[in-house]
Amino acid sequence: MSMPGLGYLILTFVVLLLLVLFFSFVPVGLWISAAAADVRVGIFYMIGMKLRRVPPHRIVNALIKAEKAGLEISIDKLEAHYLAGGNVDRVIDALIAAQRAGIDLVFERAAAIDLAGRNVLEAVQMSVNPKVIETPVVAGVAQDGIELRAKARVTVRADINRLVGGAGEDTIIARVGEGVVSTIGSAASHKEVLENPDMISRTVLAKGLDAGTAFEIVSIDIADVDVGANIGARLRADQAEAEKVMAQAKAEERRAMAVAEEQEMRAETQRMRAKVVEAEAEVPRALAQALREGRIGVMEYLMMQNLQADTAMREALGGGQRGGQPGGQDQK
């Protein structure tokens, strides 16, 4: 191959490479789409977005959508919102939906809601079509001790002005559950609640539970009310069982004290008997001492012995007569 032919080949390759690099870096197709939609975006501005690491197709497509919907939004605001971490497409869709529904919503407000982590499009849709939140089963006890289990359906509408900083669905569910428990607990009888379930919804709705939340409560409907356990009877049974245990404990304490007192009395009796035996053992010693010292004579001692023997004989005879009295009567 000659040198001129090789040069032309290299030149062609370089030109093709430059064209590929140009079309891959410069969004010509996107620029043509914007021009066809009568959206004025300079091609050098798109190159600048590339350099700022902003996908041009996201910004330009969102701008085209906004222009076709009649929204006046600058491309700088869209790019700034993207750089702040927002979802540009969702914000534009929310603005279009709000415009169609007649809701007053500006770009700055929608962008703030989106950056706050809220789904601004869903919020606009909930403003138009309220959402139904079903609470879990809530149990409450009426004043007669009967447990009631209720389930409520809460219809809420999103409040655009309170989305930033307002509480979410969990707060609504918790407040409604608290109101249901309070209403059931204030009822004198569970039959009142069963006969008029709407008394729960009226009472709860009148408390203004949507204060400080991102929603407006439209209605509260009681879906189901079931009768649970007899909590009052169970509490009374538990109280009676506790009193029984306390009475048994006190009785056991008194029995233990009586047993201890009996043991003490037995020990005291044994001590007294020991003293009597000890005193009886001192009598012969005292007699012997008296005989030695001459305070008592031998005749007196013998007379005392005879007296003791007579006394013992009479006691023996008296005991025998008492034991054999029926026999003695037969002899007579």
Swiss-Prot record:
Disulfide bonds: none
Pfam families: FloA
Membrane topology: Multi-pass membrane protein
Main location group: membrane
GO (cellular component) term, any one: plasma membrane
Superkingdom as given in the UniProt entry: Bacteria
Subcellular location: Cell membrane; Membrane raft
Protein name per UniProt: Flotillin-like protein FloA
Gene name tied to this protein: floA
